[in-house]
């Protein structure tokens, strides 16, 4: 088998889907390529042009034309919401399931009970009537404040005090009982629980979590894994090819969100 490359240009869209006005009002005019060309009409991307970028776009610019030798196509997404993680999973072979969208408040009790069932120490942290979970003294489980609110939960820890592997075990237990799109497990070294407490924020009176950047988790030794709702890695291209003895290399962001 010759080398095969999947290049993901995240957010580099070529137009809106038919239901954009209904499902995401304001996005019905989304056209990243068109917007870039409007401001930079002289932009020239020869490799993408040769591969069929303008063929898929359906029109040409002053510098980039349709390619006679290109095999090209375009597809509407099947997953729900604007979610880069599920977009990657869909490209790799996952049939998306519709996740729930709700604050961690609605999941706190079931998450706490499930963790206790497996022998973990669990404390409920409450601020201004909102709750989140502290597990084994060093792992917070709360709302993600960076994506659309209610789409994801974060599992955050300072990795000088607990291993990433143990944090992932906790994350998998959370994933077993919640139906939001993603459970994001991450941490770094060099920070402490004091940094996490200082990064605690409340949004819209409904969501409480640890602001990722303020937690200092990104500064040193950052590790992260995204656990998607209904994602079965065994049917995805990287695992299938690996099982066939074909080497697969994940480079960049995709290495964090595709297994």
Per-segment meaning from a language model:
Residues 162-165, 170-252, 257-258:
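Extended, H/D-rich, highly charged conserved domains that either
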Residues 89-90, 97-110, 237, 244-259:
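Catalytic-site neighborhoods of secreted/periplasmic enzymes
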Residues 7, 28-31, 86, 169, ...:
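Generic recognition of stable, solvent-exposed alpha-helical segments in well-folded globular domains
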Residues 8, 92, 186-188:
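Short beta-strand segments
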Residues 1-5:
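Extreme N-terminal starter segment of soluble prokaryotic enzymes
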Residues 11-156, 194-196:
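Active-site nucleophile/metal-coordination loop of metallo-enzymes that catalyze phosphate/sulfate
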């Amino acid at each position: 088998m010759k080398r095969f490359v999947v290049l993901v240009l995240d957010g580099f869209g070529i137009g809106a889907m038919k239901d954009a006005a209904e499902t995401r009002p304001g996005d019905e005019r989304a056209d990243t390529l068109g917007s870039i060309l409007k401001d930079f009409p002289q932009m020239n991307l020869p490799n993408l042009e040769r591969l069929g970028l303008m063929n898929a776009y359906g029109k040409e610019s002053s510098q980039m034309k349709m390619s006679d030798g290109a095999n090209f196509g375009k597809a509407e997404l099947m997953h729900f919401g604007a979610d880069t993680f599920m977009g990657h999973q869909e490209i790799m072979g996952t049939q998306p399931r519709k996740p729930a969208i709700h604050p961690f408040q609605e999941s706190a009790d079931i998450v706490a009970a499930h963790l206790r069932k497996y022998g973990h120490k669990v404390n409920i942290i409450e601020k201004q009537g909102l709750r989140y979970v502290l597990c084994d003294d060093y792992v917070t489980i709360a709302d993600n404040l960076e994506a659309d609110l209610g789409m994801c939960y974060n599992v955050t820890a300072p990795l000088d005090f607990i291993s990433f592997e143990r944090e992932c075990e906790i994350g998998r237990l959370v994933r077993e009982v919640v139906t939001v799109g993603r459970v994001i497990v991450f941490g770094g070294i060099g920070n402490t629980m004091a940094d996490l407490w200082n990064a605690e924020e409340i949004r819209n009176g409904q969501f409480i979590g640890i602001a990722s950047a303020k937690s200092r988790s990104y500064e040193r030794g950052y590790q992260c894994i995204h656990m998607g709702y209904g994602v079965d890695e065994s049917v995805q291209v990287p695992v299938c090819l690996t099982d066939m003895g074909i080497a697969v290399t994940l480079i960049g962001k995709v290495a964090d969100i595709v297994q």
